[in-house]
Amino acid sequence: MAKIAKRVSKTREGIDPNKAYALGEALKLLKDRSSVKFDETVEVAMNLGVDPRHADQMVRGVVNLPNGTGRSVRVAVFARGDKAEEAKAAGADIVGAEDLVDIVQKGTIDFDRCIATPDMMPLVGRLGKVLGPRGMMPNPKVGTVTTDVAAAVKASKGGAVEFRVEKAGIVHAGVGKVSFDVKALEENIRAFADAVTKAKPAGAKGNYVKKVSVTSTMGPGLKLDVSTLAAS
């Protein structure tokens, strides 16, 4: 415990909790203070001026990060026939129909992202209580209910990140690894912030983006100067 406390103290050394850091400066600080033996995930959190309890203030979408996420994503596809073959050829890890529904209903979820063809949704709909709480339920709004399964699989494998606002009005996502260079992380974060901004719902009033922060798995949370998130 003493070692952990010492490491936490060291990572926060010199960090001003009241300062809004420029994006590049914040990322350099996170990289410089990484002292663990694994490649930490860099995560961005955006506090939005919405109340997701109201349907017209829901924020949801998907963004393709230009430099990927740095993590291996296992993709499951619910499809039959030619579409199942297309999914396999595109690199899907698990492909099935009724058999895959049965497996998931029994509680075996050996994947990170789920795609379905439209004709499979009556079956996949039975899995709402299992996949819904995990944020894995296929949805046409984020491109995971589609006839173009090959493109969806490749996007999922290549850096597609889904986002959805939580009860407190916060939307967050992993946007890369500490091992990424600063430029790659900046590009990913700007792409994410831009996607969230464009997903502003009609019911949102007043200041939409209230606060943005960036952190790493074991690192400090740094408040960002929102003006530095705009594409340069």
Curated annotation (Swiss-Prot):
CDD domains to which the protein is assigned, alphabetical: Ribosomal_L1 (cd00403)
InterPro entries: Ribosom_uL1_bac-type, Ribosomal_uL1, Ribosomal_uL1-like, Ribosomal_uL1/biogenesis, Ribosomal_uL1_3-a/b-sand, Ribosomal_uL1_CS
GO biological process: regulation of translation; translation
Single Gene Ontology MF annotation: rRNA binding
Entry GO terms, CC: cytosolic large ribosomal subunit
Keywords for the protein's UniProt record, in alphabetical order: Repressor, Ribonucleoprotein, Ribosomal protein, RNA-binding, rRNA-binding, Translation regulation, tRNA-binding
Similarity comment text for this entry: Belongs to the universal ribosomal protein uL1 family.
Function field: Binds directly to 23S rRNA. The L1 stalk is quite mobile in the ribosome, and is involved in E site tRNA release. Protein L1 is also a translational repressor protein, it controls the translation of the L11 operon by binding to its mRNA.
Subunit relationships: Part of the 50S ribosomal subunit.
PANTHER family: 54S RIBOSOMAL PROTEIN L1, MITOCHONDRIAL, LARGE RIBOSOMAL SUBUNIT PROTEIN UL1M
Protein name: Large ribosomal subunit protein uL1
Taxonomic path: Bacteria, Pseudomonadati, Pseudomonadota, Alphaproteobacteria, Hyphomicrobiales
